[in-house]
Each structure stands twice: as C-alpha cells, then as structure tokens.
Amino acid sequence: MDDIAEKLGCSKKTLYVFFENRKDLVLRVISNDMKKHELEINNVIAKKLHPIEEILSLNVIAINKLKTCHPSFQYDLKKYYPQSWSIFDKKNKQLTYEVSIQNLKRGIKKGCYRKEINPEIISKIFSEKVDLVFNLIAFEAITVSFSDVFKELINHHMLGIVNEDGRKYYLNLQKK
C-alpha cells in the first residue's frame, strides 16, 4: 500500500479509510474496470451494427484494453489475488459468451454466418479461447503482443463462422 499511497500523494492511513486492505483495493479496481468494459460493450451493441461490424468494433475495444495490460497481469492476479481473478475470469467469460451468442444468432438470421453452426457451442468455445490470449507460456517461443494474438484469434473465429456472403463482407471491411 506504500507505493500506491505515494503515487496518489496521500498517506497509507488515508487509503485504509477507503480500502480494508490491498485485496479489497484490487477487487474494487477489477470490479470497476469490468463495469466500464461492459458499458463500452453495451454501447457498441446498442448501435445495432451489422453483426460482422459489431464484432470488429468490439475487437477494437478489446485490443485497446489489451494494450493497457501488463504481460504478467493474469499470472499476478491468479497468484496473489485469487478471489479477484475468479470474479474477473467468470465475469469476462460470461460477458463474452452472452455477447457472442447474441451476435451469432443475429448473424445467422441476417444471412452472413453459416446456418449450421451451433451458437451455444461456438460461443462457449470462443469465451474459453479468449483466455488463451493471456497464456504467456503458450506464446513464449515467439515474440508477439496480446493484441496480435487477439487479432489472429478474431480472424480465425470470423473465418470459421461466416458463409460466403459474410466472408466477402468481412474481407472487404478488413481492407478499410
């Protein structure tokens, strides 16, 4: 708490007025950050964009978020603040799943995603794959950023769900 108090220009005693301990501080910061992230996502969804454009807009939010994450974020949170990690992980996967399933259903209805895909299964797989972005061990042999890994994940996901019309639409948007 010393380093946090110093950066904020206040005493530790003042910090303890607002936060019970470091775990409480981390939990509240994570919770607040997740609320902001969910609001950003809901703002994109409220625009009622084409399903492919929606995914690309959400992708921009995710990449900007990933650019602010230190490479050890997930590891440190899991190791030192397991309660905060559990809340973050559960909420993130739940949000990803819910947004994905709605997007897939709209995309199938709109005729840009393959009719034969199962939105529940694809959404579950996707929500679990997003966690892979933070897996430093999986990518330690190559030098890539979180955002590069996420871009490839989205591209792989998109090309797996779109039909021919959706593919043309997606590739055309990629050129812009």
What are these language model-derived features?
Residues M1-D24, R28:
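Helix-turn-helix
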Residues R28, I41-S72, S123-F126:
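Hydrophobic alpha-helical connector segments
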Residues E53, K91, K109-I125, T143-E152:
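All-alpha amphipathic helical-bundle segments outside canonical DNA-binding/catalytic cores
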Residues Q102-R106, K110, F139-K176:
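C-terminal peripheral helix-coil segments that are non-catalytic and often amphipathic
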